[in-house]
Amino acid sequence: MSTLLSKTRRLNKILQKSGTEAIAFGDICQLLSDVMSCNVYLVGRKGRILGYSFSEKFECDIMKEKVVVDRKFPEDYNNKLINIQDTIANIPNKGICVFEGVGECLISKKISTIVPIVGNGDRLGTLLLARFGEEFNDDDLVLAEYSATIVGMELLRARQGEIEEEARKKAVVQLAIGTLSYSELEAVEHIFSELNGDEGLLVASKIADKVGITRSVIVNALRKFESAGVIESRSLGMKGTHIKILNEKLMDELKKIK
């Protein structure tokens, strides 16, 4: 049975996982490709390939390079996709490659459908379908737009999760800084101002002499940060202490104090 209902049920089996775990975008693309016999590309707002699936016997080295190797569409092409506000179905191939500067398209009878992915009023990405020799019918478009809606919800959930994680990291750093004494805070400001990037070598005695504090103040400050999971430190004996920042919000919060 290949009715719209049966296809939707197959899709729902994937989507029902979304309550407990993230949806695998590749699974959605694979299913859509199977039931509609087409290429499927799930593209993020900035052109990143979130998922894809090629139909059988599809041969286009240019597209495969963009999707499989680069994992991103060129900016000019993605801008064209983003500017499309409503579903456009059954766009015929005009004989020119969709990527600028490539020239002639060697694949004939290609028909494309572009479905915007929107969530909470924001454009989140694009669902791009390509078929050869057969137009997409109404059932195909219903399934594609349903999938785009679900993907939009998942992208919104992922975005919210990122926002919550950012807030958590920031709160952890603020709490860690709040446990420092004035002299310890002064010490960490000097320590991390001398780091090149997210990690580096610290010689506590040199910083202690430079700032005019005891070495124990530096050691205590680092222990507090390490206990909070903000940094990781490893003694290298006479060479000093190797420090690695684990929470990227640390430097931003220290800059606010200055």
From Swiss-Prot:
It comes from the Bacteria. It is found in: Cytoplasm. The keyword Transcription applies. InterPro entries: CodY, GAF-like_dom_sf, GTP_trans_reg_CodY_C, Transc_reg_CodY_N, WH-like_DNA-bd_sf, WH_DNA-bd_sf. Its main location: cytoplasm. Residues 1-156 are annotated as: GAF domain. Residues 204-223 bind DNA. One of its GO terms (cellular component) is cytoplasm. It holds the Pfam family CodY. Keywords: Cytoplasm, DNA-binding, Repressor, Transcription, Transcription regulation. One of its GO terms (biological process) is positive regulation of asexual sporulation resulting in formation of a cellular spore. One of its GO terms (molecular function) is GTP binding. HAMAP family: HTH_type_CodY. DNA-binding global transcriptional regulator which is involved in the adaptive response to starvation and acts by directly or indirectly controlling the expression of numerous genes in response to nutrient availability. During rapid exponential growth, CodY is highly active and represses genes whose products allow adaptation to nutrient depletion. Belongs to the CodY family. This is Global transcriptional regulator CodY. It comes from Clostridium perfringens (strain SM101 / Type A). The lineage of its organism: Bacteria, Bacillati, Bacillota, Clostridia, Eubacteriales. The gene is codY.
